[in-house]
Structure formats: C-alpha cells, structure tokens
C-alpha cells in the first residue's frame, strides 16, 4: 500500500512538472512515453511490445486539447504497463473530419467491470481523474474490458473542439493577408 502511494505521488509530481510543448507531435510524445515505460526498471514479467499507430491526415490540435489528450493517454499507458500484464500495448491516434480519437488498447488481464463502473478502486484516482479531464474539455472517455481479454479505452473529442482554435487561427491569418496590400 505504501509503495502504491509513493508511485501515485511521484506520478502527480511528474504531471505538475511535465508540460509537453504545444508544438510537439502527439504521436512522438506517446511513442517516447511508451518507450520510457517499457524500459521501466521494475523487472516484472516479460517485455511488452508497444506501438503507436496514426490514422488519417494529421491536423494541428488546439494546444490545451493536445496537452489534456496527452495527459489522459499517458495515464492510460501507465496503467496498461503497470497493471495489465500485457504482451502488447498500442496507442492509436485517429484524425477524422468529425472527431479526434485516441485509443489505448492492451491484450492483458482486463479490468473488472465493477471497477470501471465505479470509476476506479477505492483510494486510487486515476480513472476518476481521467474522466474529469475528459469532461472538462468536452470529450468522452469510454472503457471496454473483459477479464483475460484486455482493455481498450477511447478518448473522443469533437473536431470543433479538437481542431477549433488551430483552424480559427489559420482563418485569421488568411483574412489578415488578404486585407493587407
């Protein structure tokens, strides 16, 4: 129990200290995070195969949305590497016209339905914190899990929110160029 509290405290401090650059690519950030977690010196289990897949044409994300999406995905990756006992973990980023999606999936032991429904285990704030972050940015966070069949979690953000500020900024630049001779 003490070790868990220390780990959660260390993660909270890292969250406060780490701010991904607004112009960093989300796929690169998640790749680096997954590689770091795969190298974690816990010595438990066999190596995990980790990959990041990107679908669709990359679009600039609103910097706040990108930061929150990264923080949620990072927490999901931490949970998968620490608790799933998975052989494979994948992060999938999908740039769609109507929705921006980030999915984290593993082939591990799964999460008990009661834990997902309750929003987490007593004394643990990871699932609850991710749901709150998602809600604050107008996103949905959905969990699918079966005992022994792994877990998949999807963060979905409407494109008007995910790409909104970036698109509006480009429009302002285009408008400004047209009005200035």
Please describe what each predicted stretch is.
Residues 1-181:
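Coiled-coil dimerization/phosphotransfer module
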């Amino acid at each position: 129990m003490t070790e868990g509290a220390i780990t959660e405290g260390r993660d909270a401090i890292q969250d406060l200290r780490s701010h991904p650059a607004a112009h960093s690519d989300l796929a690169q950030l998640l790749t680096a995070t997954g590689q770091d977690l795969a190298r974690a010196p816990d010595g438990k289990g066999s190596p995990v195969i980790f990959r990041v897949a990107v679908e669709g044409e990359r679009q600039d994300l609103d910097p706040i949305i990108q930061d929150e999406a990264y923080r949620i995905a990072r927490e999901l990756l931490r949970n998968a590497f620490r608790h799933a006992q998975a052989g494979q973990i994948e992060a999938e980023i999908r740039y769609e016209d109507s929705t921006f999606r980030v999915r984290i999936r593993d082939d591990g032991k799964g999460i008990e339905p009661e834990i997902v429904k309750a929003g987490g285990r007593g004394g643990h704030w990871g699932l609850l914190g991710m749901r709150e972050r998602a809600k604050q940015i107008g996103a949905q966070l959905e969990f699918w899990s079966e005992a022994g069949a792994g877990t998949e979690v999807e963060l979905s953000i409407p494109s008007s929110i995910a790409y909104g500020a970036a698109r509006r900024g480009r429009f302002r630049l285009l408008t400004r160029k047209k009005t200035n001779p």
